[in-house]
Each structure stands twice: as structure tokens, then as C-alpha cells.
Design a protein with these regions (language model features):
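Active-site phosphate/pyrophosphate-handling residues
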Residues: 97, 233, 315
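Glycine/serine-rich anion-binding loops at beta->alpha junctions
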Residues: 85-92, 131-133, 212, 216, ...
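Hydrophobic alpha-helical transmembrane segments of multi-pass inner membrane proteins, especially
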Residues: 1-197, 236-296, 321, 325, ...
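A juxtamembrane structural motif centered on a specific transmembrane helix
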Residues: 290-342
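Transmembrane helix boundary and interhelical junction motifs in multipass membrane proteins
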Residues: 134-139, 214-218, 229-231, 248, ...
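TM-adjacent membrane-interface loops and short helices in multi-pass inner/ER membrane proteins
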Residues: 190-231, 235, 244-246
Length: 342
């Protein structure tokens, strides 16, 4: 039900913004739905998933390196690659393989040597994303790894060290990358350059304020004034035309999905499956936070999409796969409980 509500909202807004994009999104959604129906059966019947950590790790690094070297540049960041006229964003799919890699490594061992090796590979993922200037994805990967490490080891020193290194890396990124400074400055005082670097943020705030609690109604607002509104700023369009109450409902639905992920994670007995559910849940909620936080000026804009709502084939396909994996873990746990009862 939650997924259907988010998808319906997406199609309503995309139809409003661009019918062509809405049709493309629908076609990709159908393909994603078919793939998602297969995933739970694969997870329930395939025990080899926990035996190939380096397949997950090396494939993920290879895809990110390809984007870093020959990827298409969008708003200062290298995000996608084009093959046969189609463009896709590998980092959306590497988020899933990354969680599988970390879960598999920590399932094997949580001794310091293995933690150090896993941390090195995880850091390589994050570093490549930083070099590609895809800082939103880098932050998602980083937080997912630190929290998965803590769940696997229950070591508070790892958690403190990870968060501390993250803060230091954020300050370093601010000094090294000009587009990071632009985003931070636009967040701090967008009104000082309302026609330049603060334009996107201020237009989003205008849209949210204009919509009020109940919205202006479909086709009554001006969401197209916001650059790339169909992607990382679609929450502003929802607030403007459907209202703040509706937008809050979308936020609560996203939080409800996250809580379901966490409930499934706590019920899984095997550490491998527990870490997968937890890691995917963290990635999902961090992405929601970055998107909505950036639109509402709570944090600097990071350029990530709102899962299942924003336009983007890679985004919707990877999110469907993520939900399919979680559903597979739920089916696995249910089957285990039925076997115990018998």
C-alpha cells in the first residue's frame, strides 16, 4: 500500500510536469515490478548469496570507476553512463551490491583484520563517488557502512571513529570542491543571490510557502520554475499543488517503510540477513532525509532523488529491487517460523 501511494503521487506529479517523462517512468516501473516479483524467490532459495563478497565489492568498484572516468556530467557531478542511447546511473545499483558486500564480510568475521579490509573497500567506494562529485551518494554509502559496522560489532569506538572521520571528510570536501562550497553557501543564505546559486532553493521555498497546508490544486502552481523539479526537488512541487498536509503524509509513508525495514531486520536471526535489511533500510531513510532536507533548506541540497517519487529510471528500478530484497527477507523469515511451528 505504501509503495502504491508513493507511485501514484509520482505519476500524478510527473503527468503534470511532463507527460513524456511520466510514460517513460511507467514503462520502467512495469519492468521493475516484474523483476521485483522474482527477487523474493531467489533470496528464499539461494544460499550462495553469502559466499561471494568480492563479487559484490569488485563489481561495485568497477561500475563506479567507469562512471568516474567516462561518465556523463550533470550539474557538476559525474552520475551516469550512456549505452545504446539509454542512460543509467550505476551508483543507484551499487548501493545494493555495497550492502551485500559489507553484510557478507561481517557475516564471515568481525575481527579487526577483516574489519580493516572491509573498511578499505568501503572507503574506496566512497572515495570514487567523491572524485565523481556525487557527494549525496557518497554520504549514503558512508552512513550505511558506519552503522552496519556498529550493528555487526556493537563497538562504540568504531561508531565514534566513523562519525568523526565523516565530519573531517565533510570539512575537507568543503575546502577542495567548489561546487560543494556553492551548495553550502546557497543553503546558508540563498536570498543573497536569488537569481544565481540560490535560485533553486528559493524557488522551492516559494513553492512550499505558496501551497500552504492544502495546496493550490493540480495545474494551479508553477513547479517548472524550479530547475530539475521532477528529480531531487519534486517534494516542492507536491507541497505547492497538493499541499503541506499531503507532503507530510508522503514523509510519514516513507518513515513507515523504514520502520517496516527495521522491524524485519530485528526479526532476522542470521547476521547476514539482519545486516542486509538494516543496511538497505539505512540507505533508504538517509536518501529520503537528504532529498526532503535539501528541498526544505534543512540541509544543503545533495542532488539525490526521492525514492519511488522522483523521475529517474535507475532510481525507480533500484528502489524496486531494494523493496524486493526486503520482501524476500520477510518471506524467508515467515517460512522459517512456519517450519518451527511444524
Amino acid at each position: 500500500n505504501n509503495t502504491c501511494m508513493l507511485l501514484c503521487t509520482s505519476f500524478i506529479m510527473l503527468t503534470r510536469i511532463s507527460m513524456d517523462k511520466a510514460v517513460r517512468q511507467f514503462i520502467i516501473m512495469v519492468v521493475a515490478a516484474v523483476i521485483t516479483m522474482i527477487i523474493p524467490y531467489v533470496i528464499d532459495r539461494t544460499w550462495q548469496l553469502a559466499k561471494i563478497p568480492w563479487v559484490y565489492g569488485l563489481i561495485g568498484l568497477a561500475l563506479l570507476l567507469v562512471v568516474c572516468v567516462i561518465g556523463n556530467t550533470s550539474f557538476g557531478a559525474q552520475l551516469s553512463i550512456s549505452i545504446g542511447g539509454f542512460s543509467f546511473q550505476p551508483s543507484e545499483f551499487v548501493k545494493i551490491s555495497f550492502v551485500f558486500f559489507v553484510a557478507t564480510m561481517f557475516y564471515r568475521s568481525t575481527e579487526f583484520k577483516n574489519v580493516a579490509i572491509t573498511t578499505g573497500v568501503a572507503a574506496a567506494h566512497v572515495l570514487i563517488l567523491v572524485l565523481s562529485k556525487d557527494l549525496g551518494s557518497a554520504l549514503i554509502f558512508f552512513l550505511a557502512y558506519v552503522l552496519m559496522l556498529f550493528i555487526a560489532t556493537s563497538n562504540w569506538l568504531y561508531l565514534a571513529g566513523g562519525l568523526g572521520s565523516g565530519c573531517a571528510a565533510a570539512m575537507l570536501a568543503y575546502k577542495l570542491f567548489s561546487h560543494v562550497r556553492v551548495r553550502v553557501e546557497a543553503w546558508q543564505d540563498p536570498w543573497s543571490d536569488i537569481a544565481g546559486k540560490g535560485y533553486q532553493v528559493t524557488q522551492a521555498l516559494f513553492a512550499i510557502g505558496t501551497g500552504g497546508w492544502f495546496g493550490m490544486g493540480l495545474y494551479q502552481g508553477m513547479p517548472k520554475k524550479i530547475p530539475v523539479v521532477e528529480k531531487d526537488f519534486i517534494f516542492a512541487a507536491i507541497s505547492e499543488e497538493l499541499g503541506g498536509i499531503y507532503a507530510l503524509c508522503i514523509l510519514l509513508i516513507c518513515l513507515g517503510c523504514f520502520m517496516q525495514f527495521m522491524l524485519i531486520a530485528t526479526r532476522m536471526q542470521a547476521l547476514f540477513y539482519k545486516l542486509i535489511a538494516f543496511g538497505l533500510g539505512i540507505e533508504y531513510v538517509v536518501q529520503v532525509f537528504l532529498t526532503i532536507g535539501g528541498v526544505t533548506k534543512f540541509i544543503p541540497s545533495t542532488g539525490v532523488t526521492l525514492p519511488l517519487v522522483s523521475y529517474g529510471g535507475s532510481s525507480i528500478l533500484s528502489t524496486f529491487i531494494l523493496f524486493g530484497v526486503i520482501q524476500g527477507l520477510y518471506v524467508l523469515k515467515r517460512n522459517e517460523e512456519e517450519e518451527e511451528e511444524q
